């Protein structure tokens, strides 16, 4: 998984975390795949909506249903389009030139696991 430093620093700023370490995949209640990140005392998910559209938010695991998570903050969005990456938080959009986020290989692995 690739997250360019400028986007990574903005994510850390938005969520007020110092660490952002990918640890595993999970599922949201609608069965969307999620990438789970350890951020010290917090857990953040990047939920796959489509190949170019993602939700990002703080999350907690549902211990009654291991592997499934729920949002504990409002959803923010990552959009990759027209050779730009956009992070939308609280109605404000920050645009990063080029592809600042790429999880293509992880999406391929998830698709292979499903088949």
PLM feature segments, named:
Residues 1-5, 29, 98:
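Short linear motifs centered on Gly/Pro in flexible linkers and helix caps
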Residues 15, 48-52, 60, 76, ...:
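N-terminal regions of proteins, emphasizing targeting and processing segments when present
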Residues 17-22:
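Short, surface-exposed loop motifs enriched in S/T, G, D/E and P with embedded aromatic residues
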Residues 23-71:
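Amphipathic, interaction-prone secondary-structure segments
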Residues 69-115:
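Ampiphathic alpha-helical segments that act as solvent-exposed interaction surfaces
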């Amino acid at each position: 998984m690739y997250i360019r430093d400028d986007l990574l620093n903005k994510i850390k700023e938005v969520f007020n975390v110092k660490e952002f370490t990918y640890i595993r995949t999970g599922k949201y209640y609608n069965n969307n795949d999620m990438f789970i990140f350890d951020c010290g005392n917090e857990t953040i998910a990047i939920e796959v909506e489509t190949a170019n559209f993602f939700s990002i938010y703080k999350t907690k695991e549902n211990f009654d249903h291991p592997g499934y998570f729920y949002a504990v903050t409002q959803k923010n969005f990552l959009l990759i389009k027209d050779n730009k990456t956009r992070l939308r938080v609280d109605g404000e959009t920050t645009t990063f030139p080029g592809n600042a986020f790429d999880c293509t290989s992880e999406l391929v692995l998830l698709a292979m696991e499903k088949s």
